[in-house]
Every structure is written in C-alpha cells, then in structure tokens.
Amino acid sequence: DFLVPARLSPGSFYALPQSPQLFKQILMVAGLDRYYQIVRCFRDEDLRADRQQEFTQLDVEMSFVDEEDVLSLVEQMFVDVWADVLGAEVKAPFVRLPYAEAMTRYGSDKPDTRYGMELADLSEAFRRTNFRAFSTALDNGGVIKGFAAPGAASWSRQELDGLVVEAQGRGASGLVWLAFAGDDIRSPVRKHLSDEEVAAIRQASGAGDGDLALLVADQEGRANTVLDGLRRLMAERLELIPTDRWNFLWITEPPLFEWSEEEGKWVSVHHPFTSPATEDVALETATARAYDIVLNGWELGGGSIRIHRPDVQRKVFEALGVAADEAEEKFGFLLTAFRYGVPPHGGIAIGLDRTAMVLAGAENIREVIPFPKTQSGTDLLTGAPAAVDEAQLRDLGIQLRGSTRHQP
C-alpha cells in the first residue's frame, strides 16, 4: 500500500486504493446490481514493462451472475473495441484454458498461443536414467520438461551457450540441449543418454530433423518459469510470431491458494473474497471461480465470482490463518454487511493502460502513460518521491527514523 498520513488523526494513515474491491462488493449488498467505473489504482510494487505503480482500470461488478455472464460481456467489449480501433475481426467466444493445462502446455498462466513449441513432460521417460543431473532432479521431487525449437539445430556452439546463460539467468541450474540433424545428434550430454532416452525426447517434444530440443530438470515451478522465458525468446529469435493475429483466451480454474516463500505462509492467489469452486477450501487442492483474460502473452484483466456466504468467507479466512478478531478488525464492515444477505455476484477489472499498450503496438506501458514513473518509481518531471519539509512532518505528527529521507 501507498500510505497517506491523516493530519486530523495523528498517527493514523489512509491507504491509496489498490482496487475498489470491497467497496463494489458493498454496493452489491446495498442493491446496486450493476457497477461500472473507470478507476485510478495504486500499488507499491516493482515496475515491469507491463506494470506501473499508478494505473487505470475499467472496474465491473454485477449481481446475480455466473462466470459465463461476465466472460460474454467482456468478450463482446473486446470484439467491439478491436473492430472500432484496429478494424480487426475478433471472434467470440474466446478459448477457455484451465490454469493447470496452461502451466502444463506453456509453463505460464498468460501464454502466447500464436506459435507452437508447447512444453513436454519427460519425467517418466527418465525415471531409470543414469544421467545424474536428471536423476538428482527427479529424486528431489522435480520434473524434466522441455520443448523443440524448429530449425535451430544449426545454431553455433556460441549461440547455444548463450541459451544456457539465459536459462541460468532465469533461475535454472543448467540447460540441456540436443540438436537433431538427420542421424547426427549434437549435444554435450549425448554420451550420458541412451538411444531410448534420445528417442523419447524426440517423440515427446516433436523434434524433427533440423530442430533443437531444450530441456530443464528442476522443481516444476522453476522449470516452468525458465521454459516459458526460453519459449518466448526462441519465438522472437526464430521470427515465429505473427504480428496480425489476436489470440484472446481465458485462463480459468486457478488455484485458490498458493504458498508464499517470502511470507512463509499460504496466501490467496487473487484475493480472499474469491469464491472457491466447491465448499472444500483445502489449501493445496482448492480451485477458484476466477478468470484472467490474456492476449498474445499479456494479461489484460482478471476477475472472479465472489464469496457471498458468511460461512464460506470465514472458512477462507481460517484457511489463510486469519484469526476471527483480526478478520473483524480489518473486514468488519464487510462481514457485518454479509449478515443482511448478499446476492451472488462477480466481476472483473480490465487494465486500460495495458490494453492501450497492446492496441498501440508498444512494448512498454510507459509509452501510453503521460508522465510515467521510471523503473525505480521516480517521476522525472517533479522529482517525486522527494524529501518533505520538517514543519510539514511536525503537522502530521511524523518523525523519521535515522537518515531515511529520499534524495531525488
């Protein structure tokens, strides 16, 4: 959160809204069955090519709807926008891809499906391998996954070593490659692999003559992250990406919870007000009635059907380790409203800046935002964030600890 000190309440702070999530749910309880707003949001997070700390979204919430109502509404909006702005024909309904399938096939929950190179899981083919790097990964609960890059078998050793460095930069301990050129198989690990294992790689990855197989042996999450990055990189270098294709798709049925290494606990994948697919809220297996809209590898928005039953909301809080008194302190107004009856409701938020970026063909969201922040979160026009006058700090009842002032 970005915190704003309250002058009239010394020691207290406002938080700039990351999202109007709770407010729009309260509106549903109050009987406003349709809510639409273009809203400014603020999130104190690291900046990326598709992310700024201050952004604008089209926010939608509706009562007495299910997933199909929300998805069809948004699909028609994008069909109309693409026709009006680009003169491009986009057909609905969009492809629906379950989260688990997206991770299996692409290693990403926002895949670019304009080109192939889908991932293959070769773990079973190497259960009895003598190749230590693979056997160690499997013994540690990892996986062996990879894909075939068409026509890349002729790459030089220097280029292939560069791919290894790319994989390591994304967190992999290494990268195994095999270049197939007829009966000639070029690879630094060829002598460690049996003919049956090489054949399994060709079959699973779909590698043909002239293709390059790239394999990663690691924990599944890291393997997916590395291979997703390599897949996108190879598509660019091999010029496999059609520039006139708009592959909209929905990612559905994501996990309800995920383990946070940083926080050392289970957290909500979306937010704790997302409805579980069933009343079972088991931490490791529960899925959510949530959906993200993805276009050509960019996530344009996301939403969910919300929890509308107080007992289910309490179960989710308990699963997340939120004590009853803490839930009451933070979300008491929502829980109180729930006691009066809540209509089934759901919604979505569409990132307008990110959508404008894609429509404009820009590679960075800064290109479509006036006065964007730099990678370090600085406004180059005004120099913000900047030091604050001591008198103003006194008026706000704030004393800085140590030399924590920001030097512009």
Language-model-detected regions and their locations in the chain:
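Class II aminoacyl-tRNA synthetase catalytic cores and aaRS-like
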Residues: 1-408
